[in-house]
């Protein structure tokens, strides 16, 4: 566009021939530049940047989680079972009484599973999930026991939403029906058909509710939410959000609290506040030194950029929680003054970071992407490809067969290096080893340039033997000199005062 604007100004007031010539030149320029852009669209140079931003689709950012609460009072269930057992005696027909007794026994067995009692830990805990699914009994680690009353639980968080109100309403409605039938009896006669149907219906609802609780507690260990405990009428606050309920539930966290006869199931779902672009950030090595990036994921929103943590990928969306602290990487990409630390580079020269994404760090490489001609590059580059890429003879395959990640735009903030952290890593040790081997090789080259290595070896051997011989001769002469000194001292002690030597012999009388 700049050449066109400049040419139009030059051709103002000129003939039509000037405009035609300018148009031809512009077309030729575009024909020259378009192939160059296409050929290098998958290889982006980041050699002079401080970091590499990679766009990784959309992300939903939340600052807090709201709670869904499912509470169950086991003592109420037990009292309903006792009531059914007492009322079963009012039925004259034995088959009705027998069916109700079977129901009450089954409900008591299910209810005993949820009671707080000591459980012996399994030695083979990896069989726990399979055994629990078959038997329907959670083990000791499935229940997070805490002494907390229901009132304290409700007061602890004002954002809690009860989600089992509809089920409880239906159970209470059946209980009211049973009470009406009993109160409407005439003398000792009871409307047994209606009472029997109401008791059976309530037993079925109790059995379903208790089994749902058992399955929910069993799945909590894997952070899987049992959808049967959710009722659409209780999820209206979630429907108000633009995000589908299924995705919110996938990104939720669940915990079970039990106190005496009360079980509370808490589901913490994300309250989405922003819809942004997800940016993955990678460091760039300069002379084997990189910036220390404590957090490597950002959310590039319409008006601001946030550092995010705890990202969860669901079937349709990615959820991330906004980080509260100011980080180096956030300041870098937001274009603010960034206070950063550096550390020794631990990056490999050819580093595949995701499907269809490879980073070349301070290295020379022959690169070919998706069947394109081979290109020689040197420095730090981001290579993206849809199917395959060949780098220095090694082939990389994109298993997804689609290119969902694109290079982002690097900001140019004011970078302040406030410290260097000497972090030790395997790549650093490997690089130090290579440097040592290179130094040794240089030393050997210097020795070879001065003469034959065999000649230097012989000269060294002769010199060593000469030094050893000189040392041995010196020690021998020193030992002989010491012996002479000792002999001279002995001779001195053997002399008399008149200068004659003492000689041994026999004295004659």
UniProtKB/Swiss-Prot annotation:
InterPro entries found in the cross-reference section: Gypsy
Glycosylation sites: 73, 392, 494
Short name of one Pfam family: Gypsy
Record key words, sorted: Glycoprotein, Transposable element
Keyword Glycoprotein: yes
Signal sequence interval, chain numbering: none
The keyword Glycoprotein belongs to this UniProt entry's keyword annotation: yes
Official protein name in the record: Retrovirus-related Env polyprotein from transposon gypsy
Gene name per UniProt: env
């Amino acid at each position: 566009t700049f050449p066109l604007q400049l040419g139009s100004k030059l051709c103002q007031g000129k003939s039509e021939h000037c405009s035609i010539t300018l148009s031809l030149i512009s077309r030729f320029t575009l024909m020259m530049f378009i192939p160059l852009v296409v050929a290098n669209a998958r290889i982006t140079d980041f050699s002079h940047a401080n970091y590499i931003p990679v766009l990784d689709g959309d992300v939903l950012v939340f600052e807090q989680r709201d709670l869904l609460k499912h509470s169950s009072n086991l003592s109420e269930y037990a009292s309903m079972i006792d009531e059914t057992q007492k009322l079963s005696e009012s039925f004259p027909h034995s088959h009705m009484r027998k069916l109700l007794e079977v129901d009450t026994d089954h409900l008591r067995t299910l209810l005993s599973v949820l009671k707080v009692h000591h459980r012996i830990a399994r030695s083979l805990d990896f069989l726990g999930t399979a055994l629990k699914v078959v038997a329907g009994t959670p083990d000791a680690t499935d229940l997070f026991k805490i002494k907390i009353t229901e009132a304290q639980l409700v007061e602890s968080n004002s954002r809690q939403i009860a989600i089992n109100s509809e089920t409880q309403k239906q159970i209470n409605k059946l209980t009211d029906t049973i009470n009406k039938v009993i109160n409407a009896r005439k003398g000792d006669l009871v409307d047994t058909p209606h009472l029997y149907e109401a008791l059976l219906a309530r037993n079925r609802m109790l059995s379903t509710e208790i089994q749902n609780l058992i399955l929910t507690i069993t799945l909590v260990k894997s952070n899987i939410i049992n959808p049967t405990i959710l009722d659409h009428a209780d999820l209206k606050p979630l429907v108000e959000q633009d995000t589908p309920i299924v995705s919110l539930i996938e990104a939720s966290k669940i915990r079970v609290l039990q106190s005496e006869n009360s079980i509370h199931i808490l589901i913490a779902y994300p309250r989405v506040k922003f819809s942004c672009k997800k940016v993955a950030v990678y460091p760039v090595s300069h002379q084997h030194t990189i910036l220390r990036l404590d957090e490597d994921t950002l959310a590039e929103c319409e008006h601001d950029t946030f550092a995010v943590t705890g990202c969860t990928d669901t079937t349709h969306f990615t959820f991330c929680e906004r980080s509260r602290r100011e980080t180096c990487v956030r300041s870098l990409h937001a274009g603010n003054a960034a206070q950063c630390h550096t550390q020794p580079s631990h990056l490999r020269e050819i580093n595949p970071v995701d499907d269809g994404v490879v980073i070349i760090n301070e290295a020379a490489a022959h690169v070919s992407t998706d069947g394109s001609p081979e290109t020689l590059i040197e420095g730090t580059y981001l290579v993206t490809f849809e199917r395959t890429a060949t780098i220095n003879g090694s082939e990389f395959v994109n298993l997804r067969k689609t290119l969902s990640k694109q290079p982002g735009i690097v900001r140019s903030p004011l970078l302040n290096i406030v410290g260097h952290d000497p972090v030790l890593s395997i790549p650093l040790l490997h690089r130090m080893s290579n440097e040592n081997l290179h130094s040794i090789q240089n030393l050997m080259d210097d020795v070879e340039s001065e003469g034959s290595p065999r000649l230097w070896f012989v000269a060294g051997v002769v010199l060593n033997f000469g030094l050893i011989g000189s040392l041995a001769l010196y020690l021998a002469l020193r030992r002989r000199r010491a012996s002479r000194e000792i002999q001279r001292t002995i001779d001195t002690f053997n002399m008399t005062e008149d200068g004659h030597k003492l000689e041994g012999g026999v004295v004659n009388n």
